[in-house]
UniProtKB/Swiss-Prot annotation:
Record protein name field: Protein NEGATIVE REGULATOR OF RESISTANCE
Function text: Acts as a negative regulator of disease resistance. Acts on basal resistance, age-related resistance and resistance mediated by the LRR receptor kinase XA21. Plants over-expressing NRR display enhanced susceptibility to the bacterial blight Xanthomonas oryzae pv. oryzae (Xoo).
Subunit structure: Interacts with NPR1/NH1. Interacts with NPR2/NH2.
Superkingdom of the source species: Eukaryota
Main location: nucleus
Region (Disordered) location: 1-33, 51-131
Species of the source: Oryza sativa subsp. indica
Sequence motif Nuclear localization signal, residues: 12-15
Length: 131
């Protein structure tokens, strides 16, 4: 094989220039109202305030590691147990209360749709660092 046939078989097509691609794509600009912009920044403020409020808490204290201490009495044979008396049947209303499930409470967490509590004032716009 000579060099001219090798170049022809391995040559790749050139990509179109970026200006050609931009002309083909339709360009649409969505107009955004001031109310939508303010709502967006309000959501960002609530996220930042919630992060500061939730992240500022110190971590809960850790429980000390369990260090078992055994004695020889722990390994001694237990005395034979007597048969327990048969359990008494509870009344119907007690049985229903016993088997009833407790009402579900919402899990505490981050809800961005809720305004922050009044005790944690929001950061004013003038205090924010410029972008």
């Amino acid at each position: 094989m000579d060099a001219t046939t090798t170049d022809a078989t391995t040559a790749k097509r050139k990509r179109p220039a970026a200006s050609d691609i931009a002309d083909d794509a339709p360009t649409t600009v969505d107009e955004v109202s001031d109310a939508e912009v303010e709502e967006f920044y309000a959501i960002l403020r609530r996220m930042r305030d919630a992060t500061r409020r939730l992240g500022a808490r110190p971590p809960p204290p850790r429980a000390p590691a369990w260090r078992p201490s055994f004695s020889w009495e722990d390994f001694a044979d237990a005395p034979p147990k007597q048969a327990p008396p048969p359990p008494q049947q509870p009344a119907d209303h007690e049985r229903v209360a016993e088997n009833a499930t407790p009402p579900r409470r919402p899990a505490p967490g981050l809800d961005l749709n809720v305004e922050p509590p009044s005790d944690a004032p929001a950061t004013p716009r003038s205090a924010r660092a410029p972008a």
